């Protein structure tokens, strides 16, 4: 354990010295993954889906605030949707506008949360998000997480319905537009995932803030258990087809990531816990002191 603590101290010193470069590298990798995922799934406009465009956007967004990357990703999605169907692009603009209003109202300055949520779902590890957000954030982080889930499913819907939306006739376009709008608004799988994410974030955050030993580990396991149980119940009672491999593997990975986060952000020695009692003129105080 002592050797791990030494490595943690070394890592923290290294990060303190080179944090600017580390963050920019991570921002570039996030942009590369994000724009690459969008272009590989809905690359209807060939110019915008090229490797040069993907890399160029990632490089440009590396040196700008993360909110710019969020807008760039939304713009790239809309461009691809427009290349497929203008009505779909207009509906998407309205949905993105509504999500931005909610984001700006509840979590300004946290645009990276939306991006991470989209990436996690795109990489088929959705249930890492509730554990990470519940441990590091507050219940308000449900808003950007939900926006990320909706954004991912919008891309997935269009990818799956591309052939219908490519119809040249007016009737085909109208039918495709109605189908897309219905999928976004009434998709049971999407809203189930939003609900799972919200409930799990609340559970993880509630457990993490309790004054119990190993609260972070318990919170991670509790959040993963909630994800597995609710997702399995959704498959059973709503007749959904969420992959059980994705459910289990992403939940297990969420627990593993939670343990790593605890090591770096909340590493304490529970074996040396002390319970202290003292008083003043008005109150008795019972304090549980856990050394770092």
What are these regions (language model features)?
Residues 38-50, 80-94, 186-195:
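Structural signature of hydrophobic alpha-helical transmembrane segments
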């Amino acid at each position: 354990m002592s050797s791990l603590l030494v490595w943690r101290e070394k890592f923290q010193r290294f990060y303190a010295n080179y944090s600017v470069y580390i963050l920019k590298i991570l921002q570039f990798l996030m942009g590369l993954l994000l724009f690459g995922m969008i272009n590989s799934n809905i690359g209807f406009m060939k110019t915008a889906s090229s490797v040069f465009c993907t890399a160029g956007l990632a490089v440009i967004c590396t040196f700008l605030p993360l909110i710019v990357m969020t807008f760039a990703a939304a713009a790239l999605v809309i461009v691809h949707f427009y290349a497929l169907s203008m009505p779909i692009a207009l509906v998407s603009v309205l949905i993105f506008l509504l999500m931005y209003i909610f984001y700006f109202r509840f979590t300004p300055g946290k645009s990276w949360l939306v991006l991470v949520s989209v990436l996690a779902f795109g990489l088929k590890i959705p249930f890492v998000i509730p554990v990470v957000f519940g441990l590091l954030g507050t219940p308000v982080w449900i808003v950007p997480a939900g926006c990320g889930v909706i954004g991912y499913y919008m891309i997935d819907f269009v990818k799956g319905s591309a052939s219908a939306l490519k119809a040249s006739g007016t009737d085909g376009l109208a039918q495709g537009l109605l189908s897309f709008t219905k999928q976004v608004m009434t998709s049971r799988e999407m809203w189930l995932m939003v609900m799972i994410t919200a409930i799990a974030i609340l559970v993880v955050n509630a457990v993490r803030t309790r004054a119990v030993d190993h609260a972070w580990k318990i919170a991670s396991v509790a959040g993963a258990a909630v994800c597995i149980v609710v997702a399995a119940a959704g498959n059973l009672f709503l007749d959904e087809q969420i992959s059980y491999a994705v459910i289990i593997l992403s939940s297990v990975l969420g627990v593993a990531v939670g343990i790593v986060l605890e090591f770096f952000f909340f590493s304490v020695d529970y074996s040396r816990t002390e319970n202290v009692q003292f008083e003043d003129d008005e109150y008795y105080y019972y304090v549980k002191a856990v050394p770092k």
